[in-house]
């Protein structure tokens, strides 16, 4: 830029030749230009100095900022700047356009320098006071103000700030200078556009200065047009304002339409695609350069009055300068106006010439070639086979493409054969390549590349992620990066080949081409369609001119004036540009043929609910692709096509046009990433979905773009996410079986992901009959997924591993189907089903893409976890609002509202709080898809876990989710929606079926399971991967955990107290359970994240936590000595017992979870629990992680009471450690657990899993009793030799007492705790009782516990924290199998049972005897009574405990939820306000436990009420 500017300035100033010299410098290479930039600047400076009185200023300004820099120099600089501006304009636009090119780089450097220098000269632009600001302002203002303010500023600055005189003084100066200024501003801001301009400028420079000037004007307009329109307006606006009439016409024409014709075309182009538009603009310009030049000249001459009328402009400059300059630099401007004016006249020519040069040739200047454009490619044959495969290196638009061209006569999947043009080979391989790419992307990657050269550019912006866009995946596509090319092409090739071969080659090719093009083209063309049409039209004309076909076929489209040499070009064009229903009709047959099943379902759903349909479409893309493509990406494009073809397609067609710009940007953004064909499909779907509904995009962007309202914002926000998703997908593309997995092709591994969908969908489909139709995405998937529905079993082959879980799953499925059917019907199947279809589609897509996308998202979310709180809280606030709405109409109405708004929020949550949910989405996806997608890095662990326990985890997670359709749906929804709010919505929608808060279960289980159990049930795969993360994080977090637990306790106390009560107020007022579930879903881990975020963001919280942590650490340390042995022993005991239990309860990984290492490596255990929950004994190592977690989940459901009691005890212990940290005596139990916060937590969880396992099955309980009774009764009673029993006993007793002595024993128990904890661990239980009793202390412990896990272990913490949440969800779910057991039992059930069992096993006579008797009575009593009597429940007889365990199971599996919900409501009111809001589910679970066995539930309730609150 500087060079051009300097050159322009030089040339403009004394000689145009100088400008030419500068132009020559530009001509030199990018490197030379970069090097020459300064030299040229110096030269220009010197020349300016020589030429202008303000040469120095001008030079420095010129140097400083392309043209704008002069403003910084001052009035004298203004003159020089005017010159420079003029020259800069030419050069700046060049710089701008070159910026993107290598030239662009040079110019960018110059521009950057100029921009930096321009900062002063920015004043030129609009802020006289701050050059920099001015320039920035220009840039900033450029979009909207640039034309007006910037043009004024530019003028003022040009005249006043050395550039201002140019702008204002001289029309030419203004035009050129403004162009330069605009260029400068654009240069930075619109590097893409600039680079286009730059290219143009470069070539134009070669062409001539006059062209340069014109081009600058044009470029100004080009850039000005579209995103750059303001710049153009700015450039010309300066001229216009400066020169009033002179620039004004230019401004009007240029800014509004691009300089008259040129600008108009440019503006078309520019609007068409910012960069592309400009690129196309350049191309068009080249094509229309002559006409543009003439127009530009006219305009230039119109502007020339600016430029040409040096005399008037100086006056104008003076007048304008006073007008504008007074604002900015009127004096300087006026003074230098005349000289600058004259110089500017020269500059004018220079500027025009510079810009025009690079217009045609710069590929970047020309957007991606429009489909149907005829191109002649020159290439070198790399390889040709006898089979009709030609590999060529083609240079197109200065880009080299490697393409594999297929002989369409020999390859059915080759590009359409209907191409008859002289360039038919290229067309076939290139233009047809689109169709071919769809068909033989893999077969002809190179072909597509060469084709992409011709079409790839088009594809680039067209959302290379389209069937034809898949071409975008061509290497040439660039946006569709080679990875996509490879993955897409390869995948597309099989699918394409299969489909294409299966279908009539011509029809298939045509349809596929059209259809493939359809999604991509529609997105692409729609994004560029309107502009592209004009653009493509000249472009087409230009290209067509190049083509030899004498007769051009006019596009029949009413608004399309494009002409094509062959029908093929027209078809390609139509496929991409006119993918609306008419074109869809054209391609619909193929789409129907390919995806008729999915399409039918999709159309139904899509037609049924445009949003769900879009979601379905997106989902179908994921799903249908597999269906048509047998899980191959081609199938995905077909899904897209289907999507396009289907009602969603129509919707998308219409909306895609609208959103095409948006989507185009998104697609471009996404396409820039190596986007997988599937992702591309998803993106296209998203584009379509974006157009048709945010749903599809949400689907793809899942939570991010879910809301239409937020679609734009989230699209932007999620663009990054999607980019990540794209990257993930590109990564996963290889592993992308997931995407195909959604496809109903069971044969492939994808079938497993399909199974994932199936498990979800199966649950959804079976669970939601109406949803099945509505969730046509599931339905498209459903036809295949119905085959795959068994796949839930496949997915859940591990499910099979756990027959109990399977049975639970079946029970829950049945139950939830009933409930879902009920509620689906109640909710209004169409609306809810549509919503669910959308949600599930989103979920399916989210599940597929999210598996990766969410994985990335998860990583992102992990990052977000810390920074999440702000956005989360804001989103949560919106979610709360949404929850108010939703919860007002709990299950039915909320589904749409939540589905859209909440889902949006969910998507936001996905980004924000839902990160965990996406994690879990990933988890679910990963868990389910890990089998299919085991190869993916993220799922590598999961695959192990999935294979060993990961599959189990998945199956269990799936079981937990897929066991009940409601659960599955909720999982799906949870995955889709977030996994919190989303889960809530989904649950409302899907779980709403369950009269009880099934939706809440999904909230908890999906969200908690997702976040915490990312490594647990659904996290089986993702969980493994994330389990690994969790392992790492849990190890890290475990370390943090101590801090986090303690800090989190405080934080949670505060956050829970503040946030949850707020949320609670919103939600609790609604359905307490729903509120809880929503908040749990949203806040369960969201709170953790909030805590974490608060920790990260809130120094106060950190201080509080650290303080709390220190207090607890002291207690912990003390207790660590006394309690560590106990803890270790406890861990060992659970390990031993659980090891046995593990063997016995392989179904219940909790046995594994409660291994001795849990104490030493609580983090590890946590990780293991989280990730390997599914891994049972198979992957005891892993399984222990996952299995432990899952076992905990399962054991939780079985041992919800024990867990609750245990949790209460643990919380009581923690509270003790918090409270007893002051009372060092009673800190022992807490220290035991707290000493190693992780160990302690793990002990609780280990105990939980252990006790879950123990109480998972009565056998385990009995065995544990035998084991524990002998070891515990004797040693653990008071000697606490088996520290485990003692600890457990004490824990049990503590929660009992905590529950029991809610108020009475509080002080006593505290004292007792102090006394007992140290002396007798199990006696400490009573002491813990006190600690637990103290609501705040308990709450703190609860929060701490909850928070500690969630905080460091957003994933892993899911065991306790998520258990806390999920149990309600899962409990309410008939299949609390994983989540309920996992979640609830950890706190209520496990605690209660553990207490009972521990008390019984290690018959601490005091507690056990009394409480045992009480246990039966008290356990039978309700929550309030439970609290006071929780010790009794803790101590209930072993038989009672076993009975309770059975009840617990029954209760957990079928209708613990019912009572749970009732109780949940009760507890919600009570426990929810506190952290229990998060653990309220435990209370709910406790309620569930109460339902099954109120005794256990009583314990759980008591512990669940307050301990539940404190429980973490």
From Swiss-Prot:
Segments for region (Disordered): 1-23, 46-74, 89-237, 260-295, 417-545, 622-665, 713-750, 777-858, 925-996, 1011-1066, 1117-1192, 1220-1335, 1423-1459
GO MF entry, a single one: zinc ion binding
Basic and acidic residues bias (residue ranges): 201-218, 713-729, 818-858, 1030-1054, 1125-1145, 1231-1241, 1253-1276, 1291-1327, 1437-1453
Modified residues (Phosphothreonine): 481
Keywords: Coiled coil, Isopeptide bond, Metal-binding, Phosphoprotein, Repressor, Transcription, Transcription regulation, Ubl conjugation, Zinc, Zinc-finger
Positions annotated as zinc finger (C2H2-type): 553-578
Polar residues: bias regions: 220-230, 449-458, 526-535, 925-934, 979-989, 1055-1066, 1146-1157
Feature: compositional bias, Pro residues: 781-790
Compositional bias per record (Low complexity), positions renumbered to this chain: 51-74, 151-185, 260-270, 960-973, 1183-1192
Chain coiled-coil ranges: 278-304
Function: Transcription factor, which represses ZNF609 transcription.
Crosslink position(s): Glycyl lysine isopeptide (Lys-Gly) (interchain with G-Cter in SUMO2): 283, 880, 1118, 1176, 1182, 1199, 1216, 1234, 1250, 1292, 1310, 1414
Phosphoserine modifications at: 421, 424, 493, 627, 782, 895, 964, 1098
Segments traversing the membrane: none
Gene Ontology CC: one annotated term: nucleus
UniProt keyword Secreted present: no
Entry-linked InterPro entries: ZN608/ZN609, Znf_C2H2_type
PROSITE patterns on file: ZINC_FINGER_C2H2_1
Species classification: Eukaryota, Metazoa, Chordata, Craniata, Vertebrata
GO biological process: negative regulation of transcription by RNA polymerase II; regulation of transcription by RNA polymerase II
Protein name stated in the entry: Zinc finger protein 608
